[in-house]
């Protein structure tokens, strides 16, 4: 019960960050039919059942996916090759792992070619926000941590994409 309450607080804090950045994403699903259809088979347990990230939506031609966890120690789990683990337990229990899972699932099951996934953990005082770029081939790249979502609103997202040189790293 206490964990659930902390998760809700984290969800609300992330919602506030999105609002401050003037980004409107949907919680636990999507109003966009194509995304909602894809999420019908996005269970993090790998069962093929429905699964929803905390927030998902579109800014320009970018699909944004956010998975959050209240505990900082549930931010990311790496495998023995120092890559983001895709094991079911890691995907279910860790913010970055879950965000990557949803981003790859959406890359496979929608027409979106540019996906920014965010693993968020902690709270207003102490937190981590880790963006990942995932393209339509499911290639992913970890990007530098950010403090807010301001770089990802309609006014700034193209500049962020260019500044982080994402295009160059994905064009072969």
Regions flagged by a language model, labelled:
Residues 19, 106, 137, 164-165:
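Generic alpha-helical secondary structure signal
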Residues 90-93, 141-146, 156-157:
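Glycine-rich loops and low-complexity Gly/Arg-rich segments
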Residues 3, 7, 139-142, 150, ...:
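Intrinsic-disorder-associated interaction segments
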Residues 148-172:
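Non-catalytic nucleic-acid substrate-recognition regions in nucleic-acid-modifying enzymes
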Residues 78, 132, 145, 161-164:
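Generic alpha-helix signal with a bias toward terminal, lower-confidence helices
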Residues 123-152:
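Short, low-complexity, polybasic intrinsically disordered segments
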Residues 1-116, 120-132:
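A short, conserved, highly charged catalytic patch centered on acidic carboxylates
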Residues 100, 131, 138, 158-159:
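Intrinsically disordered, low-complexity segments enriched in small/polar residues
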């Amino acid at each position: 019960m206490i964990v659930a309450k902390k998760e809700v607080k984290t969800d609300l804090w992330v919602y506030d960050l999105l609002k401050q950045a003037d980004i409107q994403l949907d919680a636990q699903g999507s109003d966009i039919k194509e995304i909602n259809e894809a999420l019908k088979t996005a269970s993090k347990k790998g069962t093929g059942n429905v699964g929803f990230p905390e927030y998902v939506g579109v800014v320009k031609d970018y699909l944004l996916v956010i998975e959050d966890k209240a505990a900082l120690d549930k931010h990311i789990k790496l495998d023995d090759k120092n890559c983001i683990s895709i094991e079911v337990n890691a995907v279910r229990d860790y913010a970055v792992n879950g965000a990557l899972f949803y981003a790859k699932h959406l890359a496979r099951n929608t027409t979106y070619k540019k996906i920014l996934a965010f693993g968020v953990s902690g709270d207003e005082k102490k937190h981590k926000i880790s963006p990942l770029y995932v393209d339509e081939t499911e290639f992913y790249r970890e990007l530098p941590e950010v403090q807010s979502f301001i770089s990802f609103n309609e006014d700034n997202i193209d500049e962020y994409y260019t500044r982080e040189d994402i295009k160059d790293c994905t064009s072969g």
